[in-house]
Amino acid sequence: MSDLRFLTFEDLDQIAVEFGTPCFVYDEKTLRANAQAVSQFPNAFGLLPRYAMKSAPTAAILRIFNQEGLGIDASSVFEVERAIRAGYGTEMISLSTQELSDDFRYWAQDGVKVNLCSLNQIHTFGKWKRNERVGLRFNPGMGSGGTNRTNVGGPASSFGIWKDDLRHALDLCKEYGLVVERIHTHIGSGSDPEVWKKVASMSLDLAREFPSVDTLNLGGGYKVARMPDEKATDLQEIGAPVAKLFEEFAEETGRELKLEIEPGTFLLAHACSLVTQVQDVTSTGPEGYRFLKLNAGMTEILRPSLYGAQHPIHIVPEPAQAKFRELTDQVVVGHCCESGDLLTPAPGDPEALLPRSLLRGEIGDFCVIEGTGAYCSSMSAKNYNSFPEAAEALKKLSGTVALMRKRQTFEQIVENEVAP
């Protein structure tokens, strides 16, 4: 049990009895420590970390980060509403969205800071309200990420206004009297300090074209190391040269820009474990594999099936049995009727099975999947095969575990269906 980040067997037993499995369990101590770490990101003239709430939008998490002084990065008007319901003031919320639905008008006039992410969005916003203060999101022409699917910059990404459309964006803002006070860029999920320094420099060049800009948002994408062979982002290492660039920009222009960042994975990944149980075991013979079938899968954690992402997996038998279990190569799969519901793919290749050396699992054992705080509960194949959404719980600073989101009922799955 010493291998688990923050759970004990007693915790697992309590969770299974009180909430059932599968269940996402978040750790308040880790959440608060990570929030305090991002608040120490090097900066020259002021910093506001904004939580990328798409990574895990449950209200209890939002309330913790609000208490820690983090702002909100929302990716839809629906996330804006969830943040407000969780207690956030509109002045602490920034909206950068692929789909600028009509509802943005309501939130924009109520104080939410809107970043316009395309030339069409500038046109749409400008027609609605002239002479307004806005932000612009640009694609600086390069990106960084573990896979193409987590890279949100460069010519293969649709996010943001393409860098070569700068003049067109300037002209549109002038046409509608829009005052650009924020420049936003975001390149993806990487950890190379030189890449961050280069993107910061390119972003400052964009800010130079807008004399009214007082804030530069460099987005998030701070990689965490879920597995032993992965490299995590050192915030101090990537932030120090960026702060120096801000100082040089101030010396050159007389403008002291505030910095915003938008961490999601950094805050959440290691702050949650998915508690599941082995519900079946099967083998395909000496030339095949030993499969552990869980009572969870892509309905809770889609990242392995989508990216070939790797997560630490622990088989946790009753303590009295653990010493009699040997390490065995096993493939861990989910409960969906879908061949791609695979939890141990080859790194970066969701098509390939890769057995993992784990304690030999048996039916009824707990299986704890770690590193599941970000883009798991919020980004899964919800209700596939009509499985209900899993419960979510919080291990509080006191050590007690409390429910923060109920398991979905079958009635809730079908409640919106009507007879045509």
What do the PLM-derived regions correspond to, one by one?
Residues E256-P420:
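Charged (often Lys/Glu-rich) extended helix/loop segments that serve as interaction or gating elements
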